[in-house]
A protein has these predicted regions:
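N-terminal pre-triad scaffold of radical SAM enzymes
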Residues: 1-26, 44-63, 92-94, 111-113, ...
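Auxiliary Fe-S-binding modules of radical SAM enzymes
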Residues: 2-3, 203-344
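Conserved beta-strand core positions
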Residues: 4, 55, 89, 114, ...
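Short glycine-enriched loops at secondary-structure junctions
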Residues: 9-12, 186-191, 237-238
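Short acidic/His/Gly/Ser-rich catalytic and metal-binding motifs that mark active-site loops
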Residues: 13-17, 191-198, 242-244
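Short loop/turn motifs at secondary-structure junctions
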Residues: 16, 51-53, 85, 110-112, ...
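Conserved non-cysteine loop/helix-boundary elements of the Radical SAM core domain that shape
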Residues: 25-38, 59-214
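A short, N-terminal amphipathic alpha-helix
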Residues: 39-48, 218, 222
Length: 344
């Protein structure tokens, strides 16, 4: 499966949310149809036709665009659908730009998934961020999308002005009730040229530290994943413009935020098992894990290993990636390490 991304930066959105500099985030500066054609042609050079492929309009509020422009852009993806280069289209928009007329148009042009920029379901947080919509409008938009047969995505943030962890948890509970199909999780960053940057520079706003952002994002990730909501991204895509020198003024940015979150969740999951193993006889705690999970279990800069080593001291803690399907934790003697590490 391949996704053909088509960026329409800030197009269709009349609001300037305090954290948003959409031209920087989307990596493009115009929403012209010619620009969309150019992007599509670039991807067609290597994308093999498949009904599993998808075209995705990113970066703006698609249903807020002028109707004529919406139709012109959808005509481009209609051609791809007709040639069976793709099998469906997805796009993102604002919750308050969803109505029956708009959804009729999208459904007629092969759109299958609509992502909503929800960010929070706490009205006080939405107001402080100058989102321009309410939590109720999100609920109504999701219900209408589902009634038309669309899959629904939600984009959520942690670390917004006025948003504490309790607010994040309350939003998660409301999202679970909405039952979206997919979600993205973004820790808020202070981007150059935004109203939030002015607040930060004036000492009126303090972003989350990386560790706290990981903790809160992990909470969202875990609770949504547990009920089958697919997490399709954690953290902003670290493209050249976003990462340009001086563009990110402050905030919990990391190019592998998703891996940090998964490592944190593994730490929380495995800690009780490690402590239980430490009650057994032996001078070493051996963690055997599938090769593909080793970096996540280890944690950034061996963070998880260091954390567990303190808990089990003076025992030695050893992590080994091998060809197994599940993580195994055992307490063994140093003399038996080699044999234990080869167990199935």
């Amino acid at each position: 499966m391949a996704i053909i991304p088509i960026f329409i930066p800030h197009a269709g959105c009349p609001h300037q949310c305090v954290f948003c500099n959409q031209k920087t985030i989307s990596g493009q500066k115009t929403a012209a149809v010619d620009g969309a054609k150019e992007q599509i042609n670039k991807w067609l050079e290597w994308v093999k036709p498949s009904l599993e492929n998808e075209a995705a309009f990113y970066g703006g509020s698609f249903t807020g665009l002028d109707l004529a422009l919406q139709k012109e852009l959808l005509a481009l993806t209609d051609e791809l659908l007709g040639r069976k280069v793709i099998g469906s289209v997805r796009l993102s928009t604002r919750p308050d730009y969803i109505d029956e007329e708009r959804l009729e148009l999208l459904r007629a042009h092969g759109v299958k998934l609509v992502e909503l920029g929800v960010q929070s379901l706490d009205d006080s947080v939405l107001q402080r961020a100058e989102r321009g919509h309410t939590a109720r409008q999100v609920t109504e938009a999701v219900a209408l999308l589902k009634s038309y047969g669309f899959k629904v995505g939600v984009q959520l943030m942690v670390g917004m002005p006025g948003q504490d962890f309790a607010s994040v948890k309350a939003t998660v509970e409301q999202v679970l009730a909405l039952q979206p199909d997919v979600a993205r999780i973004y820790p808020l960053l202070v981007i150059k040229g935004t109203p939030l940057a002015k607040s930060y520079e004036a000492g009126e706003f303090e972003p989350l530290a990386l560790e706290e952002a990981v903790c809160q994002a992990a909470y969202v990730y875990q609770h949504l994943s547990e009920v089958g909501i697919k997490i399709i991204r954690v953290g902003l895509q670290p493209d050249d413009e976003l990462c340009a020198e001086g563009n990110i003024i402050a905030g919990p940015f990391h190019p592998a935020m998703g891996e940090l979150v998964q490592s944190y969740l593994l730490r929380e999951q495995l800690t009780p098992q490690i402590l239980e193993a430490a009650k057994q006889s032996g001078d070493s705690i051996l963690i055997l894990c599938p090769n593909k999970l080793e970096s996540k279990v280890r944690g950034l800069r061996n963070g998880n290993i260091k954390y567990w080593s303190v808990l089990v001291a003076p025992r030695k803690l050893i992590l080994k990636g091998i060809s197994i399907s599940k993580i195994k934790i055992i307490c063994v003697s140093s003399n038996d390490l080699e044999e234990a590490a080869t167990q199935d």
